[in-house]
Amino acid sequence: MANSKQAKKRIIQAERNRQHNVARRSMMRTFLKKTAYAIEKGDVEAAKENFAKVVPILDKYASKGLIHKNKAARHKSRLSAKIKALATAA
């Protein structure tokens, strides 16, 4: 357990930041799931709309260190490829 005033403050800050990050990560995953669901249903317009919303979120969280930049790039690349394949098939 923390003994100094500074250590106690850091524990409080760490918990606050953890809760903030959990909420942001959850929001990001929700947007990714919405996009994946639209692709699965075959709805090109909804997929493109959701993809346009999720890309800036991924970029923002990658720049802030919430997720790794390669993870953001991987998600964007895979979703983009699936949407492109869906659009050409339709």
From Swiss-Prot:
GO terms for biological process: translation. One of its GO terms (molecular function) is small ribosomal subunit rRNA binding. GO terms for cellular component: cytosol; small ribosomal subunit. The keyword Cell membrane does not apply. Transmembrane segments: none annotated. It comes from the Bacteria. SUPFAM superfamilies: Ribosomal protein S20. Keywords: Ribonucleoprotein, Ribosomal protein, RNA-binding, rRNA-binding. The keyword rRNA-binding applies. PANTHER family: 30S RIBOSOMAL PROTEIN S20 (PTHR33398), SMALL RIBOSOMAL SUBUNIT PROTEIN BS20C (PTHR33398:SF1). Binds directly to 16S ribosomal RNA. HAMAP family: Ribosomal_bS20. Belongs to the bacterial ribosomal protein bS20 family. This is Small ribosomal subunit protein bS20. It comes from Francisella tularensis subsp. tularensis (strain SCHU S4 / Schu 4).
